[in-house]
């Protein structure tokens, strides 16, 4: 069967566990062609011989997407419940501090989201919009992120920075602790380090970094508050959104329990982890509607 760029495929050698789209075709040193693959719902990049690929039919694609949407909706509902409880708590706190009750307003933390995948960036921006997180989205190749981040931080002045895209671990290239055995972990680490040179304090700029199978420990050591992937598993395309939404909607006087953040994600503690971090939401008053 002839495959083309844009085709939806799965790999026979992996029991067709992940749905991919073909994003490129390259020639190996031996002269044969291989397909470059991006996960359709997970942030995984891979390459494959065409002989290992099988086309995924439309009905199978729809079935997988419906299952994925169901999981996404569960996570979104958890976020909405958390935010509802937060608003009720803050309403009580804000009005109980003053003799005259005034209307108040919320200022959620601003997010700068750098993504190596333009299609995933669009998906993430749609979810940010649904849940009301203020965000600036930038499509940037993983290898160019480190050189771009200082200018972007000056321009957008975010409270939260997301550094993500695609990644993968290859045991043929080295051991699990060897950063050179990962497709883009090194570039994510360099970007975090550059951002931290500019804004060292962990609570002045909250950073999420990583993608599928990323080198979690190196990202945390570089200065990320949250990162992937402790067990080197795949993470969902929207997992970064669920993490930063929780941070964005948590008041800056409160510390965020790491498990409280991870429970809203699709991958949870096998794919994501982090350190104790302050929220970035601020509350003000009075609020005057037009």
Curated annotation (Swiss-Prot):
Domain of life: Bacteria
Disrupted gene: phenotype observed: According to PubMed:10714992, cells have an altered coat protein composition; CotT, YeeK, YxeE, CotF, SafA and SpoIVA proteins are present at increased levels and/or exist as precursors. According to PubMed:16751597, cells show no effects on vegetative growth or spore resistance to heat, chloroform or lysozyme. The germination of YabG mutant spores in L-alanine and in a mixture of L-asparagine, D-glucose, D-fructose and potassium chloride was the same as that of the wild-type spores.
Induction: Induced by SigK.
Protein name as annotated: Sporulation-specific protease YabG
Keywords per UniProt: Hydrolase, Membrane, Sporulation
NCBIfam families xref list: spore_yabG (TIGR02855)
Gene Ontology terms describing biological process: sporulation resulting in formation of a cellular spore
Disulfide-linked positions: none
Database matches in InterPro entries: Peptidase_U57
Annotated GO MF terms: hydrolase activity
The protein's Enzyme Commission number: 3.4.-.-
A matching Pfam family: Peptidase_U57
EC class name: hydrolase
Protein encoded by which gene: yabG
Any Gene Ontology CC annotation: endospore coat
Cell compartments where the protein resides: Forespore outer membrane
Function: Cleaves the spore coat proteins SpoIVA and SafA. May cooperate with tgl to mediate the temperature-dependent cross-linking of coat proteins like GerQ.
Family assignment from sequence similarity: Belongs to the peptidase U57 family.
